A protein has these predicted regions:
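A contiguous loop/helix-start segment that scaffolds small-molecule binding in enzyme catalytic cores
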Residues: 148-220
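General beta-strand structural signal in soluble alpha/beta enzymes
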Residues: 19, 45-46, 80-82, 107-110, ...
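Short gly/pro/ser/thr-enriched loop/turn and capping motifs at secondary-structure boundaries
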Residues: 24-26, 51, 112-115, 163-164, ...
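Class I S-adenosyl-L-methionine
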Residues: 1, 5-103, 192-193, 199, ...
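A generic local secondary-structure boundary/capping motif
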Residues: 7-8, 69, 122, 143-146, ...
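Cofactor-binding loop segments of dinucleotide-utilizing enzymes, especially the Rossmann-like FAD-
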Residues: 22, 83, 137, 159, ...
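Class I SAM-dependent methyltransferase SAM-binding "motif I" and its flanking Rossmann-like core
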Residues: 83-150, 200, 213-217
Length: 220
C-alpha cells in the first residue's frame, strides 16, 4: 500500500525487475512488489550477503550492475526494487554509483523507514526549530551520546546487535523512558515495545528507536 503511484507505473512498465535478496533467504522487497508484477518480466536477483566487511559486498554490486547494464544494452527497461527510499540508507545507492554515469537513471522517492516508524508510533518528529538526527547504532557510545544530546528528536537505526549498547547510552543520559522501539514497521508482524521491556542485546534488522528530548512534541 505504500508503493507510490509513480513507482507502480514504472514497475508495471518494466521489462526487467532487479532486486536484492539475502544469500540465504527470500527477498522481502520482491514479496512486497509481487502482486503488482506482470508475471512475465525477467528478474535479476542481486544476492547480498549481510556482512560488516566492505568486500565481498561490493563485488556483489559489481555483478548486479553488470547484469542490469547488459539488460539495458539489449534495449530493455529495468526497474530496481528497494525498501523505503533508495537514497536513505538504501542499497540501491551502490548500483546507482555504478550505472548513473553510463545510463539515464530515474530515482523515485519512497516512504522512508523514518517516516513509516514515526507514523506507526503516532509520534511526530519535528516542529518549528527542532533538530532531527538519524543515528546509526554502529556508532561508539561517546559519539552516540553526543548526537543524542544535540538533537530534539533522534532516530536510532541499524539497531541489530547494538541494542545493548544503545540501551546503555539512553539510560546514561536519562532518555530510556522516552525511547520508542518499533520493529518491522507497517508489516503484518510489526511490534512496538517499551524499551525497558526489551530483553537481550540484539534486535531484528528492520528495527528503530525514536527518542524525543522532551517526550512530546507539543510540550515545548
Amino acid at each position: 500500500e505504500l508503493i507510490t503511484l509513480k513507482a507502480l507505473k514504472i514497475l508495471q512498465a518494466a521489462d526487467v525487475v532487479a532486486y536484492p535478496a539475502p544469500a540465504d533467504g527470500d527477498s522481502l522487497v520482491r514479496s512486497i512488489a509481487a502482486p503488482h508484477m506482470s508475471g512475465d518480466q525477467e528478474e535479476i536477483i542481486i544476492s547480498t550477503p549481510m556482512v560488516t566487511e566492505r568486500y565481498p559486498a561490493q563485488d556483489v554490486y559489481d555483478e548486479g550492475a553488470a547484469e542490469i547494464s547488459a539488460a539495458v544494452e539489449a534495449g530493455k527497461n529495468v526497474a530496481v526494487l528497494c525498501e523505503g527510499d533508495p537514497f536513505f540508507y538504501g542499497s540501491f545507492m551502490y548500483l546507482f554509483a555504478r550505472l548513473s554515469e553510463s545510463y539515464a537513471v530515474q530515482v523515485v522517492p519512497g516512504v522512508t523507514s523514518l517516516a513509516a516508524c514515526s507514523a506507526e508510533l503516532a509520534l511526530p518528529l519535528a516542529a518549528r526549530n527542532d533538530v532531527v538526527s538519524v543515528i546509526p547504532g554502529t556508532l561508539d557510545e561517546e559519539a552516540m551520546e553526543a548526537q543524542l544530546m544535540a538533537s530534539n528528536t533522534a532516530a536510532i537505526i541499524k539497531v541489530g546487535r547494538h541494542l545493548g549498547k544503545i540501551k546503555n547510552v539512553l539510560e546514561k543520559i536519562g532518555a530510556a523512558e522516552r525511547a520508542h522501539y518499533i520493529e518491522r514497521a507497517t508489516m503484518e508482524n510489526q511490534r512496538i515495545v517499551p524499551l525497558s521491556e526489551l530483553d537481550g542485546v540484539s534486535a531484528p534488522y528492520f528495527s528503530m528507536i525514536i527518542v524525543r528530548r522532551n517526550g512530546e512534541i507539543l510540550d515545548q
